[in-house]
Amino acid sequence: VLVVTVLSGLANQSLRRGLQAADAERTLQQRWGTRTIERVFLTEASRLFELREEAAKELKLQTPPPPVVRTRIDLGGVAFDVLLGDEDAKVSLNAMYHRVGPESTAKAIGQVAGRPVQQSTRFLPAIRPLRIARENLVLQPNNDEEDAEMIPDAFRSWGEVFDLATLEKSLGNQAALPAATKELTCWGSGQLNFDRASDEAILAVTSSVVQDGGGRRLLQRYRDNPTATLDILLQTEVTNPRNRDQLKELLSETSTNFSIWIDAQAKTGRSMRTFTAMKRDEEGVTQESRFSF
């Protein structure tokens, strides 16, 4: 009986060590795969979106494809769900917050992501809106001093925008955050890429400055004539100079910032979800923000 007890204890101990080793190996595979995919996709993000745009033009699509690319990759027995995003084709919450205020920012979230997502907002900004801090000074895009100053980030993580527990409960799944933020960003340049953004994102931004009807006319004019430049559209469709200047601050035709969600799922054990945003400053230096969930 003693021998059986000893052997049983040794077997259990060996099993535990084996499971721990398997867990460590699985975690290593998840981390290695995540970092590899992250590095490759973010490095080639600009080209990937350009190729997709070329394909959309060949197919003569009336509306641009969404500002995200989804794919699934299997590496070493681990499945990686990948969501690559163009951050400059999403509504910049930092730019909206500073230029049009928290109420309009919350409204824009509802317009783009839906009412349940808007109801999950819980703004915890690092600083006050720039306009309030400057006693409602109107920002002018041609002011040299203003151009030299980068808008500080009020929101540096999704936890400063949403009550994440409420958001997950409202949408009913653990992937609530990637789904809710596919057209929202805290890491873009602050200007929405008019060529790549969805109709909803464009209307959310433009209607914060001009009446909804004016934003729709601007969008329709662009859809009718997609070769028209943003400057020409604003010049012909927005008569108020101050509104036109504000829209120039909020809209652009380029993208330089990208992000990636990666959900690494092994056959056993818990999944590993990460979000990484790549942002370039005015000098072209790239900074990465990385979060694990």
Task: Write out the residue ranges for each language-model feature.
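Compositionally biased linear targeting/interaction segments
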Residues: 1-293
